Amino acid sequence: MPYLYRIAYDGTLFYGFTGHSRSLEPALKRVFGEILGRGSRTDPGVSAVANTVMVSQKLPIALVNSKLPRGVWAWAIAEVPQSFNPRRAKFRHYLYVAPHWGEDLGSMHEAAEVLAGTHDFASFIQRRGEKISTIATVMEIKVELRGDLIYMHFVGRGFKNKMIRKLAWAILAAGRGIFNIRDIRELLERPRPGVVPSAPAEGLVLLNIEYDVDFQIDYTALRSAYVYFLSKYRHAVAHAAALKAVGETLATWEQ
């Protein structure tokens, strides 16, 4: 029987999940051998709490993590049927975080409301060359202000290439007055591929892929990942504050 592992990783350390020698998947293959399936092919710079990989052999999580590179953890395992497809999830939950620079939250909420639902998202997809359906359903988009940060939650069964980053850019653009709600409706009703840029990858995190599967959690591995990300967060906050101080000091020389 195949096995499904939940994987957390720091996306800034890898060139995406797959498709490159510096991607995460080659490191996973060195541990597991063949990868039978994966839950999400995250972009370079995108981190994950609970991506998944399906493999043919059951290995102890402690052994797996001893062989994985820094910034990657397997932290749960489940036995699944031979016919299981990790792409067919109940839903995927992504979070996009951006600094709040005065964006109008009301306009952002309105944009999120328009973009949620079933639409032709051709304006919000970057095609890889293959012919794909551009119709998709976004179950929920939630926008909230937490301190000086904007949190945007995206929930759906599946998302196309660059789709969340483009949706995030459009919602932020609505808050900045770059787009109005009529513009966003027109992008859905009369698609214009290539018009909407992608928001930076580093703000995006895959929080969860939900399945009807009973995972066994390794709490030692989970805590190891938690300590790593908490430590990195503390350093990032200090670095950001230092950069702000540099900018403020430079500005005093202009007076």
From Swiss-Prot:
Keywords: Isomerase, tRNA processing. GO terms for biological process: tRNA pseudouridine synthesis. Substrate binds at residue 94. One of its GO terms (molecular function) is RNA binding. Its EC number is 5.4.99.12. It catalyses: uridine(38/39/40) in tRNA = pseudouridine(38/39/40) in tRNA. InterPro entries: PsdUridine_synth_cat_dom_sf, PsdUridine_synth_TruA, PsdUridine_synth_TruA_a/b_dom, PsdUridine_synth_TruA_C, TruA/RsuA/RluB/E/F_N. Disulfide bonds: none annotated. The active site is at 43 (nucleophile). Formation of pseudouridine at positions 38, 39 and 40 in the anticodon stem and loop of transfer RNAs. PANTHER family: PSEUDOURIDYLATE SYNTHASE, TRNA PSEUDOURIDINE SYNTHASE-LIKE 1. HAMAP family: TruA (MF_00171). Belongs to the tRNA pseudouridine synthase TruA family. This is tRNA pseudouridine synthase A.
